[in-house]
Amino acid sequence: MAETPKNSETSKGTRSWWSKNWFYTVLIAIALIDGLSAFGLPLIVSQPYSAGDSISTLRQAILAATGGVLAILTLWESRRKNIQEKEKNDQDHTPQVHAERRARYAKALEQLADAKAPVRLGGVYTLIKLVDEWLADEKTLPNEEERREEGQVIINSLCAYIRSPFDLASKTEELSEHKAPENYEGGNQQFIKDQARFREEKELRLTILEAVRNRLNKGTRVHKNGTQKLLPGQWSGFDYDFSNTVFFYPVGFNNSYFGASSNFSGAEFTENTNFSKAKFVEKADFSRAKFAKKADISRVKFTDADFSGAEFTEKADFCWAKFAEDVDFSRVKFTKNANFYEAKFTKDAKFYRAEFTEKAGFTRAKFTDADFTGAKFAEDANFSWAKFAEKADFCWAEFAEKADFTWIKFADYAQFGWAKFTEDANFSAVKFTKDVEFSAAKFAKNASFSGAKFTKNAKFSWAKFTKGADFSWAEFIRNTDFFEATFEEKPIFEYELYSEIFKAKFSHRANPEDYNFKVSHNSPYKIETKEQEHNGIKFVIPKDAELFDPDEPSE
């Protein structure tokens, strides 16, 4: 039966009385029981248990035991009250602690706005200390997420200061000199004043970045196989917003563990930048960022990264970088060498309309889905030994100097339609596992496909070869289409080296109609063909080529 309100109130009242008086009730009960036992039990026991025992001895033993129990209970209750009192004092003290920290935070913000650099620096140190205090305060703020939120507020203030404009940032190069340049605005005296203020502000901002970096890793853990794992630091769980910041000083976040979002979009790095061996667990946004000096982003582990519209004026080093999710380099401008040696792109890698003014190195890089549509390579482009697990799109790409695609494996569709190769293009020993298209591509110099393997359809329709086109030792297994192609020189399907002849091979397992060698009627050179029969089936293939069985590699 449900308890009536009256009974409920009675029950609550009983529990309330019991919770307040249980100790004294138990204490009195024990004293009464043991007292009665001490005086009553000897009357019940007729004789001592053994020689030498007496009634008084038994009574004393019972009273002694009772006293011990009461003493223990009293001590326990005293300790319990002390703990409760301490907890109450802590609870009463918590608001005071939090209020005191927030007051220090407000004061530190005032200091950051002060005209004097030492005062601003004092505010910075206070803010750094406050973040550490919040994170370590499990006593007054047990919830970890709440501690992080309190720290994030202060981190936001530090980032806001880094983002704030500095009027002398535009004179970084001049103020970094030992003496005033000629015609310096305000003369030598003004230069001395500006330089002192410039150095003070530079030191202050570097102090903030150093404090952040020192707390973004807790060292590394070395595994049995020798690999190292970067450990997150106490500040790794914060979001960092450095968007549109002008970094007029070197930036070093090497070996830093960014466990939350990192925003460097629109930032300007006027000095050397070092992110080597850093790790970005969440999105790293470098879109529209400008790197005026060397950018070391080697061995960095990215999850989701955006470099779209970024500009690299000096060398950009992405060697051994790893991108776990999509990465966007569309419309990026690399003025100097860009090196992606052994970089690993686990998902989509977008280099749409990217511009490489000097050498572009992608040797041994591993791509999944790669988009280089409309990309421009002003100097050598090296993709040798790279691997493309899915689609590789170089449609409309322009290669002004040598293009090296030797020993590459394309596991999926490869698109080079309308691409322009101004200098030599080398596709020797390439494996095209799926369809490949060079439709309307233009080769101004030598184009080598020697030793290449075309497993599926190979399309060269409307392609234009101005110089030599070498297909010797290449293997064509399926459809091969040279419809309306143009050859300014005689195409090569046979090559002799040390008295050994290497011929292009065409599969006799393909449909004879899938071989099309009808080049443009305006082509100065045609593909000379011959008719060859296999098992009663006639094939038309280049004169210097031969039929083969792709299932018998030794043939």
Question: Model-predicted segments: where are they?
Answer:
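Short hydrophobic membrane-inserting helices
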Residues: 1-73, 77
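Periodic self-assembly scaffolds
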Residues: 48-107, 138, 142, 146
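N-terminal leader/targeting and pre-domain segments
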Residues: 92-94, 103-110, 115-121, 125-128, ...
